[in-house]
Amino acid sequence: LVVVGGDGTVNEVVNGLKGARVPVGIIPSGSVNVLSLELGLPHTVEKACAVIAAGRTRDIDVGIVNGRRFTLMVGVGFDALTVKNLNPASKRRYNEAAFVWTALRKEVRQGGPDFVMKAGDRRFLANFAVAANTRYYGGRFGVARKAQPDDGRLDVVAFRDRSLVGLVSFWFGALVGWGGLHVSATEARAQQVEFGLYGGCGPVWYQVDGELAGTLPARVSLEPAALTLYVP
């Protein structure tokens, strides 16, 4: 099976497969191609086809949130609200730059409700969190710096700082690969993650692989080595 598109298209295919072990090839053509970046896939049609023809495969983990499968991450809080409000034309033209600009503007102006997150035996209060299967997020932002798509774990980064300085420094850190090291960020690893409302606040939105998916509560789990992809 060959997919031509971005992360949203890949997500639809993964959900359509519903666990069927069919090797999947990806020819990147979307506005953001985080999975392709993570796997080192070429971004030209000819080279991407050559990777598929070579036949080398890699099994990666697949996450599940409230019944929906994903390959990249679940983002909760202001990033999901940003996805909800992001102008499609801006997304196509500016990619991750449009995302960060919209996120900063939205969070600084309006803020967002806190929520509770449980990862393993640890609990956090946050206004933004990512349960990640991969390092990269929204493009080349290294939010979950230790994540690997085949390690059987979700890497969680929780953040709680609404100040402009805090937000800018967090996203700058993510751009150079150490977003989880921010003073206001907390990292954890787990096979299951739960997100819930805090103090009657809500609704709190979440996004899956860059697409708006719903509101909390949400339960995230992982299927190890559940998807086979063609890789270089």
Describe the role of every protein-language-model region.
Residues 1-21:
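N-terminal small/polar loop signature for handling phosphorylated ligands or for N-terminal nucleophile
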Residues 12-15, 35-37, 140-141, 168:
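Short glycine-/acidic-enriched loop or helix-start segments at secondary-structure transitions
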Residues 18-23, 27-131:
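Catalytic core of DAGKc-family lipid kinases
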Residues 75, 79, 130-144, 212:
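Glycine-rich phosphate/pyrophosphate-binding beta-alpha loops
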Residues 79-82, 125, 137-140, 164-168:
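Short acidic/glycine-rich loop or secondary-structure boundary segments that cap or lie
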Residues 90-98, 145-166:
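Gly/Ser/Thr-rich active-site loops/lids in small-molecule metabolic enzymes
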Residues 111-113, 125-127, 150-155, 189-191:
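A generic structural signal for short beta-strands and their flanking turns/coil linkers
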Residues 121, 148, 158-232:
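ATP/nucleoside-binding phosphotransfer catalytic cores, i.e., glycine-rich phosphate-binding loops
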